[in-house]
Structure formats: C-alpha cells, structure tokens
C-alpha cells in the first residue's frame, strides 16, 4: 500500500504540469495560510452568537 503512494508521488513529481502548480498559485499563498483558521473562527462566531442571545 505504501508503494502506491510512492508511485503516485513519483508520477506527479515528473509531470511538468504538477511541477508548475505551486509557482502558478503563489499569489494565493496568504489565503492558503489563513484557511485552516476559518473553522476556529466559525466556532468562535457561534459561541459569540449564543452569548448574545443568552444561550437559549
């Protein structure tokens, strides 16, 4: 099973299309850095909302 992942990585590393993706999407790096925080912000927003309505 581990060989499947290694073979997949080997195929993608030799493909010029996949090799250019990070460079092509370098403009969206700041957005990608913030994306993991979005679920935490959603949780905090729900908590603040419930606090605003007195936890009904």
UniProtKB/Swiss-Prot annotation:
UniProt-listed InterPro entries: PSII_PsbK, PSII_PsbK_sf
Cited Pfam families: PsbK
GO CC terms: chloroplast thylakoid membrane; photosystem II reaction center
Membrane protein topology class: Single-pass membrane protein
Tree of life domain: Eukaryota
Keywords associated with the record: Chloroplast, Membrane, Photosynthesis, Photosystem II, Plastid, Reaction center, Thylakoid, Transmembrane, Transmembrane helix
Propeptide regions on this chain: 1-19
Transmembrane segments: 35-55
GO BP annotations, alphabetical order: photosynthesis
Keyword presence, Transferase: no
Record localization: Plastid, Chloroplast thylakoid membrane
Subunit annotation: PSII is composed of 1 copy each of membrane proteins PsbA, PsbB, PsbC, PsbD, PsbE, PsbF, PsbH, PsbI, PsbJ, PsbK, PsbL, PsbM, PsbT, PsbX, PsbY, PsbZ, Psb30/Ycf12, at least 3 peripheral proteins of the oxygen-evolving complex and a large number of cofactors. It forms dimeric complexes.
PANTHER family reported in the protein's UniProt record: PHOTOSYSTEM II REACTION CENTER PROTEIN K, PTHR35325
The protein's role, per its UniProt record: One of the components of the core complex of photosystem II (PSII). PSII is a light-driven water:plastoquinone oxidoreductase that uses light energy to abstract electrons from H(2)O, generating O(2) and a proton gradient subsequently used for ATP formation. It consists of a core antenna complex that captures photons, and an electron transfer chain that converts photonic excitation into a charge separation.
Entry similarity comment: Belongs to the PsbK family.
Protein name: Photosystem II reaction center protein K
Organism: Pinus thunbergii
Taxonomic lineage from the root: Eukaryota, Viridiplantae, Streptophyta, Embryophyta, Tracheophyta
